[in-house]
Amino acid sequence: MPKLILCRHGQSEWNAKNLFTGWEDVQLSEQGRNEAITSGRKLKENGIEIDVAFTSLLTRALETTQFLLAESDQEWIPVHKSWRLNERHYGKLQGLNKDEARKEFGEEQVHQWRRSYDVKPPAQTEEQRESYLKDRRYRHLDHRMMPYSESLKTTLERVVPIWTDKISQHLLDGETVLVAAHGNSIRALIKYLDNVSDEDIIGYEIKTGAPLIYELDDNLNVIDHYYL
């Protein structure tokens, strides 16, 4: 029976500082590393054997994958990295303290940017975007596909192709697949898998560094899902 493991990265240094992160590349905090290690230990204790892993191009997700696989004695499995699993792009909000953003733009406006399904934060300027265009990890990505800002809706639109083309193919072969990614890219996958409404998905909270197990039938319909 195919099994999907969704794991949001452990707490990052910017999570700890209450900053909007998005596509900014930051490392795990000490707490985040411990969360990832604990997740790997839980997988090992529950006898879960992973066949293949998928993660984003951002360090906090890569570190989570590494710690989780090392702790579960599965470092040798193939790991595929893709920009499509990156966190939602928060545009001009990236790097801002969330409390300071609320003071500047208003509580209601920031809540709408964060929690509405199809509302994007203010877009980055060309100058702000330049650092991504020069980043080697995106050198094979058509720059026209690189976002200036994203809503959860547009995040879902870029996540679905990697599900359809790659992740689901391993599951259809009966494999156990780990996806170690980010709050919003995982939220997008959950919406897609569980057919969650636009209104309901915005209230979903994804725990950091905690394996969320999806048990699927042979047609990839959801049988059950639960946190370890």
Curated annotation (Swiss-Prot):
This protein's superkingdom?
A: Bacteria
Q: Which UniProt keywords apply?
A: Gluconeogenesis, Glycolysis, Isomerase
> Where does the record place the catalytic residues?
H9 (tele-phosphohistidine intermediate), E87 (proton donor/acceptor)
Q: Note the SUPFAM superfamilies from the entry.
A: Phosphoglycerate mutase-like
Q: Which InterPro entries match?
A: His_Pase_superF_clade-1, His_PPase_superfam, PG/BPGM_mutase_AS, Phosphogly_mut1
- Protein residues bound to substrate: 8-15, 21-22, 60, 87-90, 98, 114-115, 183-184
Family annotation (SMART domains): PGAM
Gene Ontology terms for molecular function: phosphoglycerate mutase activity
Recorded catalytic reaction(s): these are: (2R)-2-phosphoglycerate = (2R)-3-phosphoglycerate
Q: Locate the site labelled Transition state stabilizer.
A: H182
Q: In which pathway does it act?
A: Carbohydrate degradation; glycolysis; pyruvate from D-glyceraldehyde 3-phosphate: step 3/5
Quote the Gene3D superfamilies the UniProt record gives.
Answer: Phosphoglycerate mutase-like (3.40.50.1240)
Q: What is its EC number?
A: 5.4.2.11
Q: Name one GO biological process term.
A: glycolytic process
- Pfam families for the chain: His_Phos_1
* Coiled coil residues, start to end: none
Q: Which HAMAP family has this protein been placed in?
A: PGAM_GpmA
UniProt xrefs under PANTHER family: PHOSPHOGLYCERATE MUTASE
Sum up the protein's function in the record's words: Catalyzes the interconversion of 2-phosphoglycerate and 3-phosphoglycerate.
Question: Of which family is this protein a member?
Answer: Belongs to the phosphoglycerate mutase family. BPG-dependent PGAM subfamily.
**Name the record gives this protein:** 2,3-bisphosphoglycerate-dependent phosphoglycerate mutase
